[in-house]
Amino acid sequence: MGDYKAEIEQVYAGLTDQPPHTEEQKVMAKKIIELHLATFKYYDYKRTFELVDENYRQHSQMVADGRDSIIEASKVLKSIAAKNWKGPGEPHFNMMFKRILVDGDYIVAQIFSERWPGDAGEHVFDLYRWKNGKVVEHWDVIQQVDAAKMKHGNSVA
């Protein structure tokens, strides 16, 4: 694991509005947090390869099958973040995990993602299939947030 173990624990501790996890579910939830941090914040692609199965199946319309595809997606997102990046660190989306639900081999992560400071953001649901300690499959739904069109004062996440 990279130097972000404390950050994984901090993110996990911030998940308060959800059912409790068993010990096995905690491990799975923390691995999903680690996957997101390694791939989309710290660009630790060696760790990404360790967490994602070589036969990874993708259902997002923007990403291909195979674990190389998740790295290509990371590079695209980094280039988007870099357009308005003000630091510190490397450009990345600010991902705020709201909930992680685990049921059997499935893990659902609800995330609010800001592409740059001041961005209205994106509301993301990621669904992963977990097998033998690795992510083997992924689905997602991404909703662009438009604060001007909100018909209520609640957050989307």
Label the predicted regions.
Residues M1-A157:
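C-terminal and inter-domain tail/linker signature
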